[in-house]
């Protein structure tokens, strides 16, 4: 065998291991794709079971944080004279307040205009002292200090203003369910008197999950 044949044989011998090595990444890629699909299905399953702080007639749905759910309360403001104010403390059901150490992450207010609504209202949520009587003067000062976000909701011909939600983040404050009695929803009727049949406020309190009863009520 001459020198050229020896060189050619040597090259062929060196190629064989490389042919075998090419199949390894292909197998690993297939396994990775299967694992990715399984994780994707798992994420979809977990997301589907997570509560959502939304309402079918409202836009901008928000999924609750993992491990959290929400409790909703409804507030219907009484008549508010033009340029006047209304305040209501957050009072959760007893079935929720008994777990007063569960953390609260966010408070969401959804403004639901009724058919007769034709006004402009300002809405906010504030932490208030236990001694506060939520008088007109006290509420007016809280709107003026700029310490909380304010939602300005105006009449819209479509019936629902594009932005009808206010989201108040309490995560950094480490607030819990027991603290909710220290918070109040405040309303300012700016341009017109707000009648009792014009507006409903839905307040969603996002909090850590609480045990549910396994016994039917008597």
From Swiss-Prot:
Keywords: Acetylation, Capsid protein, Ribonucleoprotein, RNA-binding, T=3 icosahedral capsid protein, Viral nucleoprotein, Virion
MF (Gene Ontology): RNA binding; structural molecule activity
Region (Disordered): 1-28
Keyword Cytoplasm annotated: no
Lineage: superkingdom: Viruses
GO (cellular component) term, any one: ribonucleoprotein complex
The keyword Protein biosynthesis appears for this protein: no
Family recorded in the similarity comment: Belongs to the cucumovirus capsid protein family.
Cited function: Capsid protein. Probably binds RNA and plays a role in packaging.
Record's comment describing the protein's domains: The N-terminal arginine-rich stretch does not seem to be the major RNA-binding region that allows formation of an infectious ribonucleoprotein complex.
Protein name according to UniProt: Capsid protein
